[in-house]
């Protein structure tokens, strides 16, 4: 019996415990009441249907109360794993034309659950009768040798179509895809397939962009090919690169219904890249359109071997098997497709159709003997048009290809055969709706003994991956929207001076405004994989440079601008390119500190200064920034120098000299007296002036219990020096003083002088 063969084919147990036991028993009891004379059968297995009178013949899918009860019983039996008994009930319902394909959803789901994932379920080996024609078989003979010569590193494959990268476009998130794969994305799916970042730049200059212009929106720039990566792929892998171009040309011809011309393109592409699963999968669809079903099956089987977890390859194999009359094998493949993607309505629909047809053993054998697959999909037996079962994700992700070519159409092809061809489009990209468990990692194929990658190292030159700015190996490579790649630090330094690409002069104001530079993932992996020693040396140079920049005693960056004091806030407006670089380096090294000195017409900058610590930076779209910093320590300049356009210095830090005994008591009295005098002066100011001081410098610090506790002295002293109406040259000596007593006396004299002038 066909049901027994199905069970053996899938290695399904006769009975499996299930939570649906009570439902099954209730269905069986109901059937027992309706059927009457079969109480024992109803309790143990499927109940037979009463004899049908000829005059009671019903149209397909007509439901009666007893058929509904038996359908419930069959679904419950299938849920329990009692597939044999469930199939018997389904068969009887089908013979009475009281069963439609849509009612087999529960059976298909249960069968698909029995299909193990991964290596446990390799698709069934092909029949001897499914061998392709001599031409295609000859191609397979030399495929292994050619594949070994053109084996491509997995990193060079597009993560949307899973084929070799063609016209690679690197997005702002750092991931790279084929240009055509990105252009075919609809508005709702315009996101990176890997990280999910929304990509407004995917709207190219088409009708969608014109619609944006009509709506008053600025259309995004067109997608640009990654210049370095495209040239490198063409140099290292001319075969796969050319094959990818031929694939896209064949896709275009197929959409234009030039099926024979598309086949020629794919034949040439397969010779250049015989290990590309996408080529075989797409060519299988072309053969199917041309009604060369044996060749279609042959190519689909190769695609399944190259990518065992690929949904489309198994789906096309199943369609070819069904057309050739091999319903059992087709059902197995359709169930495998359902296990890969349970949400795919097309696979479920076809599996339900094959399940419905399978019990009619004699008709199936006759159809297989005739080689006519059209009877397998008799629309009189199956309710509904399969065209409505297109998966939503596929409709949005793939551009529709009409599989009916005028040249390929034949009067012998049945109506249902045309429907089946319309269901299956050449995949320009894989569906994104694949389940995670199936799409994360593919199990090893027959080519598992081959190395994971094969690169023609003789033609590989490290100079192909050199930055055009520093002339060194890319370190943290970043690709601009115009398609050029630079080291991250090199690009940032260029944007400090001009918001344009250093090579093509395209505007990069958007990059400057967002300041979100994502490293190019594929280029980083490429360098790490094939140039490990060069990368090690490059990283060593970078780390040495960062270590030198993080030294706060030698070559300390100096901002020549104004006076700064310990504990006093110092907001800065940064707009000069050299200081943009300096501030960025201070943040990158983690020190977040730099020196502030007054300018000197003779020496360049003053001998004494103050270290500032960056608390926050607010960037503007044009590259300018406002830095919120605060004074930390005083220093003395030992040696001046320059680095990349800004001043640096070797410095030594200075502190106040502590006193003890009577000198300490005298210092305490002086400290209290000057603090009181300073507080009276501040409170005597006009309210408007006082508010301006408070908004800029904050409130006056409290008096310290021990004025010598801080190596730089009391915080209120520095606050008072910052707000006193003194010229910078008059304030500088206070910064250089190492005696707190001298500093307090100086502040007292200044306050006395100001008070006399006010009076």
UniProtKB/Swiss-Prot annotation:
A Gene Ontology term for the protein's cellular component: cytoplasm
Pfam hit, one: zf-C3HC4
Renumbered residue ranges of the record's region Disordered: 1-69, 360-454
Residues in Lon N-terminal domain copies: 546-755
Domain of life, source organism: Eukaryota
One GO MF term attached to the UniProt entry: zinc ion binding
Gene3D superfamilies per record: LON domain-like, Tetratricopeptide repeat domain, Zinc/RING finger domain, C3HC4 (zinc finger)
Organism listed in the record: Homo sapiens
The protein, known as: LON peptidase N-terminal domain and RING finger protein 3
Transmembrane segments: none
Xref: InterPro entries: Lon_prtase_N, Lon_prtase_N_sf, PUA-like_sf, TPR-like_helical_dom_sf, TPR_rpt, Znf_C3HC4_RING-type, Znf_RING, Znf_RING/FYVE/PHD
The TPR repeat ranges on this chain: 67-100, 243-276, 278-310, 312-344
Assigned keywords, A-Z: Metal-binding, Repeat, TPR repeat, Zinc, Zinc-finger
Zinc finger residue ranges, RING-type: 158-196, 467-505
Gene name of this polypeptide: LONRF3
Comp. bias intervals (Polar residues): 57-66
Composition-biased stretches (Basic and acidic residues): 380-393
